[in-house]
Regions:
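Loop/turn elements at helix/coil->beta-strand transitions in domains of secreted/extracellular proteins
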Residues: 51-52, 77-78, 104-107, 219-225, ...
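Membrane-embedded segments
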Residues: 57, 61-144
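C-terminal regions of proteins
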Residues: 241-242, 246-295
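Secreted/periplasmic serine-hydrolase-like ester/acetyl group-modifying domain
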Residues: 125-223
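Residue-level recognition of beta-strand->loop/alpha-helix junctions
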Residues: 83, 229, 256-258
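Alpha-helical transmembrane signal-anchor/signal-peptide segments
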Residues: 25-45
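Acidic-and-aromatic substrate-binding clefts and catalytic sites of carbohydrate-active enzymes
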Residues: 86-90, 202-205, 231-239
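Hydrophobic membrane-insertion alpha-helices, especially the h-region
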Residues: 3-24
Length: 295
C-alpha cells in the first residue's frame, strides 16, 4: 500500500511538472508568435498584438468584405481586419476590449451576421482562444466569470489548453512574419448562384449583451462605431429586421447592404453565397467608405 501511495505521488508530481513545462514553452511561443495568416495566429494577433486607427470586427463575412488598404488610402488612417471565421459578437467584444488595453482605435467597423447573434457560434469564442487563458486579461476574465465551473477547472491545466496547439504554432513559425492587415481575399467565383434563405432567427441574450457592451465601450472612449450587413446571397429577413430595429433603438450608425445594387446579384462579385470575392469586396468597401464619410 505504501509503495502504491509513493508511486501515485511520483506520477502526480511528474504530471504537474509536465503541465508546468508545457505552459512555459507554449506561452513563450505565443508571446513571440510571428504574424502568420493561419486562423489561430490571426486570433493571437488580433487579441494580443495588432494596433490600428480603424478596427474591423466580425466573422468571415467581414474578413472577406472589408479591405483595410482602401480605408487607409481614402481616410489616411491605418486599418486592420480582425474578422474571424465562425466567431460571434462575444469574440468581437473580447477583441475590442483587448485592443483598448494597448491602444485606442478612432473607428470600429462591425460586420454582422445571424450566426454571430443567435448563439450557434458561442462555444467558439471560448474554445478557439483557450491558449490565451492567463495571457489575455479580457479573455481570462470572461472565462473566470461567465463560463461553467468545469470549464474553469480545465483551463487551469496547460496541457488541456495547449494540447492541440503545437501543430499550428510550428506552422506559424515556419511561415514567419507576413505582416498581414487581416483581410483575406477570395478569388474563386462560382458558375451559378442562387439566394439561400434562412428562417427562425432568435437573438441570443448574452451575445446581445456583448453587442451592447461594444456600443457602450465605443461611446465611453469616443470611438466612432459603424455597423453593417455586407452584400449577401444568404438572406435572413428576420435577422435583418432585428438588427435594423436594434441599431435604431441604440442610436447606432447602421446600413444594410444585403441587396446593394452595385454588388448584388452579379455573380463575379461573390466567391460563394455568403462571401464576397475580392472584386466584390473592393467595390463594397469603396461604397461603405463613401457612406461613412457622408455621416
Amino acid at each position: 500500500m505504501k509503495k502504491i501511495f509513493i508511486n501515485t505521488v511520483i506520477i502526480a508530481a511528474l504530471l504537474v511538472a509536465a503541465d508546468l513545462m508545457v505552459g512555459l514553452v507554449a506561452k513563450k511561443l505565443i508571446t513571440n508568435l510571428p504574424d502568420s495568416t493561419i486562423l489561430e495566429s490571426d486570433i493571437v494577433q488580433s487579441m494580443q498584438n495588432k494596433q490600428a486607427d480603424i478596427l474591423i470586427l466580425g466573422s468571415s463575412k467581414a474578413k472577406h468584405s472589408f479591405v483595410p488598404q482602401l480605408f487607409t488610402d481614402s481616410l489616411h488612417l491605418s486599418a486592420y481586419n480582425a474578422g474571424c471565421d465562425g466567431h460571434d459578437v462575444i469574440y468581437a467584444s473580447l477583441v475590442l476590449q483587448s485592443w483598448l488595453e494597448r491602444c485606442q482605435p478612432k473607428i470600429v467597423v462591425l460586420g454582422l451576421w445571424n450566426s454571430m447573434l443567435d448563439g450557434s457560434w458561442r462555444a467558439n469564442s471560448v474554445n478557439d482562444c483557450k491558449t490565451l487563458y492567463d495571457i489575455n486579461q479580457p479573455y481570462t476574465q470572461w472565462v473566470d466569470t461567465q463560463e461553467p465551473l468545469t470549464t474553469r477547472i480545465k483551463m487551469t491545466s496547460s496541457i488541456y489548453r495547449f494540447n492541440s496547439s503545437m501543430v499550428w504554432l510550428m506552422k506559424s513559425y515556419r511561415n514567419g512574419d507576413q505582416h498581414s492587415d487581416g483581410y483575406s481575399p477570395l478569388f474563386e467565383v462560382p458558375k451559378k448562384m442562387t439566394d439561400t434563405p434562412f428562417e427562425g432567427f432568435k437573438p441570443d441574450e448574452e451575445e446581445v449583451a456583448q453587442l451592447k457592451h461594444i456600443i457602450t465601450l465605443c461611446r465611453e472612449k469616443g470611438i466612432k462605431l459603424y455597423m453593417a450587413l455586407a452584400p449577401d446571397h444568404e438572406i435572413d429577413a428576420a435577422m435583418r429586421r432585428w438588427v435594423a430595429d436594434f441599431c435604431k433603438s441604440e442610436g447606432v450608425w447602421f446600413r444594410d447592404y444585403t441587396f446593394e445594387k452595385s454588388v448584388y446579384p452579379e455573380i463575379t462579385n461573390f466567391s460563394d453565397a455568403g462571401h464576397l470575392s475580392d472584386k466584390g469586396a473592393q467595390i463594397f468597401t469603396r461604397i461603405f467608405i463613401s457612406d461613412m464619410r457622408q455621416q
